Amino acid sequence: MTRSLKKNPFVANHLLGKIEKLNMRAEKEIIVTWSRASTIIPIMIGHTIAIHNGKEHLPIYITESMVGHKLGEFAPTLTFRGHARNDKKSRR
C-alpha cells in the first residue's frame, strides 16, 4: 500500500535540518545519513547524500527524477555473486 495523501512524506528531522542549513548558506557538501526510509523532496535536488547500505556510505547526487522515491532505493544492500555451480570441480 502507498502512503496516504493526507500525510506528508516522511523525511528524518535531522536530515531535513542539515539540508535547510546548507540551502540557507548556499553551500554544497556531502550529507551522511543512515535514514534509508526518508523520501526525496524537491529541496534536496542538487545535494549529494551519502546513504548507508549496511557496510559503507554510498554518495548519491540527487536529481529531479528522484523526487518521490526513498533514499534506500539508490543504495543497494545485497550483492549477487551468482548461482551455485553444478560441476565436480566446485565441490572439491
Curated annotation (Swiss-Prot):
Gene3D superfamilies: 30s Ribosomal Protein S19, Chain A. Signal peptide: none annotated. InterPro entries: Ribosomal_uS19, Ribosomal_uS19_bac-type, Ribosomal_uS19_CS, Ribosomal_uS19_SF. It is found in: Plastid, Chloroplast. GO terms for biological process: ribosomal small subunit assembly; translation. GO terms for cellular component: chloroplast; mitochondrial small ribosomal subunit. Its main location: plastid. GO terms for molecular function: rRNA binding; structural constituent of ribosome. Keywords: Chloroplast, Plastid, Ribonucleoprotein, Ribosomal protein, RNA-binding, rRNA-binding. Disulfide bonds: none annotated. Protein S19 forms a complex with S13 that binds strongly to the 16S ribosomal RNA. HAMAP family: Ribosomal_uS19. Belongs to the universal ribosomal protein uS19 family. This is Small ribosomal subunit protein uS19c. The gene is rps19.
